[in-house]
């Protein structure tokens, strides 16, 4: 898209190293600065090693066309405070650079600075390259709104600290965003605690985001919503970082900071490829993931909600949500966890799916969080063993505050700690659940401090004898169960075959185990269980079959799905 000089409605701002020329009324030049004083349409072009545009009026459209503009004393573009309906539109390749020193007292330390209470929308039809050598690239102050409208172009952002920030509100609609943040966050809306007027919200309607940053990729103080989009994110040195210190830094993929009522993260759809030194997804309040594809490698938790975590829509097809935590300390964690549907994979060095309380790193907590394991990678990460506890849990401290409810989905857990672990209760209403842990009695495939109730669904637990009493939670008349107690060494394949010899369940045993439990509506005493070693030799395991003895279905009084 190019704009012709024949348009009399456009005021042209032409930069060169010898000065700035203005083609009409509405803008005033003073030294290396041109100030837009009246509403209207303007086009900036040219090249200058020291220049600056100040938008001083509402209802301004500022086109950028083949503009190369740098400044060592202020931001190349400044939008003054309390302005509405300001549009900045890149229609041809534009490069903006800020070379200010961070110690400057008169500058803006940004490439584009939007001041308090202004509303600015951005459109990009070409390549928009922005370098922030001082601090930030695009920065909105208190109560600002920055809206990135539908665009076909690419934002190529390199920031010393933050790539895109607004204390008030950020919204993204289409476009490609390539962001490198050397010493800060990539995208954030995180006003100071003393600023109670700014919203601290981020909405992503769409877009393609390629992000590398030292700290968090997306941070919102109160609310972060993704409707859809494509995200390729790496924080710090990735999930296997040996330099990340969680006690002094935060390097999460997506984060909601506050834990006040109403604060939440919602991921409605999208494609995500996350490689984070810290948690991949972290909300200090609630977190909902409904649809999309998620590939997660996390140095700490894969998915964490300090309060309520919901995965999948109830009764939805499982292929609508594909959530794969392929490496983590704890796979999926929340005070309450509700799994409705989807394909859920949790791979963890500690617990796979864990209902526990409080925050895991952004706010202090009262209790110890044990660190008994000795993984080489994990020990190299600072602050893991004997670290401070997970923080305060809301409401009562009893078991009733914590629960896991599974209504459906295909759930796969591979872990060194407990597979499905609740500080309170576990309710299984449906789904196909496979848990592979290890033979250490302190780490069980299913562990709970409150009650365990299996109303419906298939459950396969492979690991230790600590879950020997799990059958007591199966509701009478619903399920049959079978178990095997005996040592089985690692590197074998477990297969369960029905009366017709068809394989109905299988999985890889990658750790030494001593107990297997299986329950299903379809199970009968004609089923057979086998393990196959690396040579292909198949051996039958002699399982014990049983019927549940518990009474009528109990009401799931703790489930608020």
Give the role of each language-model region.
Residues 1-561:
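A composition-driven surface/loop motif
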């Amino acid at each position: 898209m190019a704009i012709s000089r024949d348009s009399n409605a456009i005021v042209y701002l032409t930069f060169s190293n010898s000065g700035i020329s203005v083609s009409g009324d509405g803008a005033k030049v003073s030294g290396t600065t041109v100030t837009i004083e009246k509403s209207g349409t303007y086009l900036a072009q040219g090249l200058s090693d020291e220049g600056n545009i100040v938008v001083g009026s509402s209802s301004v459209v500022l086109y950028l066309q083949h503009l190369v503009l740098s400044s060592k004393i202020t931001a190349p573009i400044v939008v003054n405070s309390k302005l509405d309906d300001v549009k900045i539109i890149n229609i041809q390749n534009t490069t903006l650079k800020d070379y200010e020193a961070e110690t400057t007292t008169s500058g803006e330390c940004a490439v584009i600075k939007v001041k308090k209470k202004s509303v600015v929308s951005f459109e990009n039809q070409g390549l928009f390259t922005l370098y922030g050598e001082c601090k930030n690239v695009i920065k909105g102050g208190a109560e600002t709104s920055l809206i990135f409208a539908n665009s076909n172009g690419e934002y190529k952002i390199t920031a010393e600290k933050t790539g895109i920030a607004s204390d008030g509100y950020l919204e993204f609609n289409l476009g490609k965003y390539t962001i490198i943040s050397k010493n800060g966050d990539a995208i954030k809306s995180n006003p100071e605690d003393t600023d109670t007027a700014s919203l601290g919200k981020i909405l992503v309607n769409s877009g393609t985001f390629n992000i590398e940053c030292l700290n968090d990729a997306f941070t919102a103080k109160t609310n972060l919503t993704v409707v859809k989009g494509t995200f390729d994110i790496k924080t710090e040195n990735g999930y296997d970082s040996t330099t990340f210190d969680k006690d002094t830094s935060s390097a999460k993929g997506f984060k909601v900071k506050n834990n006040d009522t109403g604060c939440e993260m919602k991921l409605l759809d999208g494609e995500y490829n996350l490689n984070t030194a810290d948690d991949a997804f972290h909300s200090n309040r609630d977190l909902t993931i409904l649809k999309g594809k998620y590939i997660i490698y996390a140095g700490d938790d894969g998915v964490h909600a300090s309060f309520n975590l919901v995965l999948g829509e109830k009764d939805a097809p499982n292929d609508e949500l594909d959530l794969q935590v392929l490496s983590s300390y704890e796979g999926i964690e929340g005070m309450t966890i509700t799994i409705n549907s989807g394909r859920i994979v949790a791979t963890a060095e500690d617990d796979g799916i864990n209902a526990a309380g409080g925050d895991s790193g952004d706010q202090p907590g009262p209790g110890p969080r044990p660190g008994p394991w000795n993984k080489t990678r994990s020990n190299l990460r600072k602050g893991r063993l004997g670290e401070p506890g997970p923080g305060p849990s809301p409401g009562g401290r009893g078991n009733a505050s914590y629960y896991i409810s599974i209504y459906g989905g295909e759930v796969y857990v591979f872990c060194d700690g407990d597979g499905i672990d609740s500080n309170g209760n576990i309710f299984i209403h449906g789904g196909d659940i496979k848990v592979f842990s290890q033979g250490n009695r302190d780490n069980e495939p299913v562990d709970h401090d409150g009650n365990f109730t299996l109303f419906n669904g298939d459950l396969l637990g492979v690991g230790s004898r600590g879950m020997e009493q799990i059958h007591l939670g199966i509701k009478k008349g619903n399920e049959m169960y079978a178990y095997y107690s005996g040592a089985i060494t690692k590197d074998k394949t477990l297969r369960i075959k029905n009366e017709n010899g068809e394989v109905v369940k299988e999985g890889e045993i990658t750790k030494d185990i001593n107990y297997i439990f299986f329950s299903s509506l379809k199970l009968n005493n004609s089923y057979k269980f086998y393990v196959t070693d690396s040579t292909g030799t198949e051996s039958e395991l002699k399982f014990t079959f049983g019927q549940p003895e518990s009474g009528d279905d109990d009401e799931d009084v703790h489930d608020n799905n």
